[in-house]
A protein has these predicted regions:
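Gram-negative outer-membrane beta-barrel transporters
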Residues: 362-373, 390-476
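Short loop/turn motifs that connect adjacent beta-strands in outer-membrane beta-barrel proteins
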Residues: 34-42, 68-69, 120-123, 169-174, ...
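Flexible loop and strand-edge segments within Gram-negative outer membrane beta-barrel domains
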Residues: 83-85, 98-108, 121-175, 181-208, ...
Length: 543
């Protein structure tokens, strides 16, 4: 993986697929493109990780030239862990129990191969990906009756996809095409002969997906671009269940966008059309067909020519259709699940400055305030098992929040460098579905009012020091904000130290990690305790 980018709303560039215009927030993962230096014809990297929970995690990466403008990359990884760890439950004037988390083992294999090509004013990529795993579900831990339930549920997954992309810039016109085929298999087993607390479930799910996309951008004037994008997606879900409806979904998306960029002012507007048709083998078993149009308006303004200070704002209407998993999976799916509609309002400021003198090299500050109106918000509520989540709608939700991100770069002497990043989020997400309910206006489940993180990356010659702090504040595990449903705030501190060694053309990096340094006993989801202090050791060899 070369880069991971997170966007609230959508990317600032209009040259993208139609699907990209439809997300309230997106994560973009960019595959690593091979780069060769000093006339090399290949790059190789071998990594091995081990540590707590019986972890064994070898991986290999091999990149090679296939021609002057074509290269290939093979990557593979195997991961095994017993998943066993101790955790503690304490109650004032009550029990003090230490247990061992069991049935959390994981065996996973990943393999992928990509081909990357460059051409005049363009590039193309193709990738094949395979993933196979088996894992156990530890299940919920009951405080008052520790060890009563064994939780022997198992899950097997196999995932495969082929995807390709083509990008070319012409005079006044740019073309981007994407295509993907994906196959996903899931086998879930719950056997009462192994765990008397459960019912017998032996489900097999198979999903197929075909996706094609074309984005076309036209340079009308030097300051004016227009984009027209069209996507088509086909999904099919099969399962060996009694009376299963075997759904097939056809989704067509079309987007028209325009962008104006002047000296210190930028403006974008787009309209996305979403057309969804479903059919099933059982009469009246499909969700209703949908046809929706959702607009977006984005603006950015730099008030001062001499300072990199910007004001930005956007409005976005989002339509979210429930996935086939949301609608049709056993124990999870809800055929009566309604689509989700969101109106997003965001205003923010950014400030960036580089310094020529002093220890502070650079400063980047981003502050955003937002207000979201959500109708029929889709949320997943945990049950007694990690596989069996329940999908439900919350009729009316209002979300008010502030995001703050500050990043700075420091040089204390010739070899001492420090990067620091602080993130803070305040979010008030209230449920206004039923005025007569006792929880009208309460915070929705599992959304904290306050959360944040601190990341420090220090470098001294060939030494690398990293510290990470994550905090999640008070929240509630159900719609009613009462003491019985309160989830405690939690925090973790992680630390790592690395050292590089060079020998001829080989670079060796040794890393030691300590996670959850202060052995915080916490739960992200009620009754699912997380690990305490744990360690990891990594050796990385690059040729």
């Amino acid at each position: 993986m070369e880069a991971i980018s997170l966007y609230n709303g959508q990317r600032s560039a209009i040259f993208q697929s139609a699907k990209d215009f439809g997300s309230a927030g997106s994560i973009y993962m960019t595959s690593r493109t091979p780069r060769f230096t000093d006339g090399k014809k290949y790059n190789a990297k071998v990594t091995f990780k081990t540590g707590s929970f019986g972890v064994a995690n070898p991986s290999v990466l091999f990149e090679h030239r296939l021609g002057e403008h074509v290269s290939g990359a093979f990557s593979s990884e195997y991961m095994y862990t017993t998943g066993k760890y101790k955790f503690s439950y304490k109650k004032k004037n009550g029990y003090d129990t230490t247990e061992v988390r069991k049935n959390g083992d994981v065996r996973a294999l990943r393999a992928e191969y990509g081909v990357f090509g460059r051409m005049n004013d363009g590039e193309w990529k193709a990738k094949a990906y395979f993933y196979d795993s088996e894992r156990g579900y530890p299940g919920a831990s009951v405080r008052e009756e520790p060890g009563k339930f064994k939780h022997q549920d198992r899950q097997w997954d196999s995932n495969f996809f082929l995807q390709g992309s083509f990008l070319r810039h012409f005079s006044g016109y740019s073309l981007q095409m994407n295509a993907k085929y994906a196959y996903d298999y899931l086998h879930y087993l719950s056997d009462p002969r192994l765990d008397v607390s459960t019912m017998y479930v032996n489900n097999h799910f198979r999903q197929h997906e075909i996706y094609v996309s074309s984005a076309n951008m036209f340079a009308i004037l030097p300051f004016w671009n227009v984009d027209v994008s069209v996507d088509f997606q086909w999904n099919k879900l099969n399962a060996d269940l009694v009376d299963f409806v075997y759904p097939t979904r056809y989704t067509t998306l079309g987007a028209v966008a325009t962008a104006l960029h002047f000296d210190r002012f930028k403006f974008q507007a787009s309209v996305l059309g979403t057309f969804v048709h479903e059919r099933t083998k059982v009469a009246n078993g499909a969700a209703d067909d949908m046809q929706e149009y959702t607009p977006t308006v984005v603006m950015a303004w730099q008030p001062f020519r001499v300072a990199d200070f910007n004001v930005r704002a956007f409005y976005k209407r989002v339509f979210r259709m429930p996935t086939l998993n949301d609608l049709y999976y056993t124990f999870i799916g809800n055929i009566n699940l309604e689509p989700e509609y969101t109106n997003q309002y965001n205003v923010g400021v950014t400030y960036n400055r580089n310094f020529d003198k002093g220890v502070l090299l650079g400063l980047d500050v981003q502050v955003d305030a937002y207000y979201n109106e959500v109708s029929d918000k889709i949320i997943a509520m945990p049950t007694s098992n990690q596989f069996r989540w329940t999908m439900v709608n919350l009729g009316e939700v209002e979300i008010r929040g502030v995001d703050v991100a500050v990043q700075s770069n420091w040089r204390f002497c010739q070899h001492w460098l420090l990067d620091a990043r602080v993130n803070y989020t305040y979010q008030k997400a209230q449920d206004f579905t039923k005025k007569e309910s006792t929880y009208y206006g309460d915070q929705i489940p599992y959304i904290p009012w306050h959360s944040g993180s601190l990341i420090l990356n220090g470098t001294y010659k060939s030494w690398f020091l990293n510290y990470s702090f994550i905090y999640t504040g008070k929240r509630y595990e159900a719609s009613a904000n009462i003491p019985e449903n309160r989830a405690k705030e939690w925090y973790t501190s992680d630390f790592s130290l690395s050292k590089n060694f060079s020998w001829r053309k080989t670079v060796i990096r040794l890393t030691a990690e300590v996670n959850n340094i202060f052995n915080q006993q916490y739960e992200v989801v009620q009754c699912y305790p997380m690990p305490g202090t744990n360690v990891k050791f990594i050796i990385n060899i690059e040729i």
